[in-house]
């Protein structure tokens, strides 16, 4: 006798996990308080926090999702916090960075109204060369003797 034929299994539908559209605020730390809207017509993604009122806008493309706008916001906040976002170096004056040298400050205090010893030597060399060219001190005796 023959075996009973097994029925074929139907393929299972894949569950597509939707990405979040509500996020945690980076400033006030409230959960799911940041909502994201995508304006694909104008290519602008906007985030805004309902609690603290913080907002952010960035350019998007046709494939962008709300999580992309949130990640851009996260990167921008990190960039500002690390100091790379500012154009001025005002915050660097009081810090003790490994890359700063104290010799720059020493040079500034020395050059305030004082002449550097190297500059004095250059001035005396220029005067000596100028005297030779003007004929005050002849290097070679003339042939007229």
Curated annotation (Swiss-Prot):
GO terms of molecular function: RNA polymerase II complex binding; zinc ion binding
UniProt keyword annotation of Transcription present: yes
Subcellular location: Nucleus
The organism's taxonomic lineage, starting at the top: Eukaryota, Fungi, Dikarya, Ascomycota, Saccharomycotina
Sequence ranges of Acidic residues compositional bias: 88-104, 113-126
Protein name: Transcription elongation factor 1
Keyword entries, A-Z: Metal-binding, Nucleus, Phosphoprotein, Transcription, Transcription regulation, Zinc, Zinc-finger
Chief location: nucleus
Phosphoserine, modified sites: 55, 117, 124, 142
Record region (Disordered): 80-145
Anything else known: Present with 5860 molecules/cell in log phase SD medium.
BP term (GO), one: transcription initiation-coupled chromatin remodeling
Xref: InterPro entries: Elf1, T_Elf1_sf
KW Nucleus (keyword) present: yes
Family stated for the protein in its record: Belongs to the ELOF1 family.
PANTHER family: TRANSCRIPTION ELONGATION FACTOR 1 HOMOLOG (PTHR20934:SF0)
Signal sequence segment: none
Binding positions for Zn(2+) per the UniProt entry: 25, 28, 49, 52
Source organism of this protein record: Saccharomyces cerevisiae (strain ATCC 204508 / S288c)
Function, in words: Transcription elongation factor implicated in the maintenance of proper chromatin structure in actively transcribed regions.
Cellular component per GO, a single term: transcription elongation factor complex
């Amino acid at each position: 006798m023959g075996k009973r034929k097994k029925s074929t299994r139907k393929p299972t539908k894949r569950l597509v996990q939707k990405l979040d559209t509500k996020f945690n605020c980076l400033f006030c730390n409230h959960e799911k308080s940041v909502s994201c809207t995508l304006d694909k017509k104008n290519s602008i993604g906007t985030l805004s926090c309902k609690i603290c009122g913080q907002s952010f806008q960035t350019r998007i493309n046709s494939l962008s999702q709300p999580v992309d706008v949130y990640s851009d916001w996260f990167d921008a906040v990190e960039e500002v916090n690390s100091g790379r976002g500012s154009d001025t170096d005002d915050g660097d004056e009081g810090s003790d960075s490994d890359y700063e040298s104290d010799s720059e400050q020493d040079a500034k205090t020395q050059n305030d109204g004082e002449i550097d010893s190297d500059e004095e030597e250059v001035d005396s060399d220029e005067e000596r060369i100028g005297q030779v060219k003007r004929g005050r001190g002849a290097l070679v005796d003339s042939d007229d003797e």
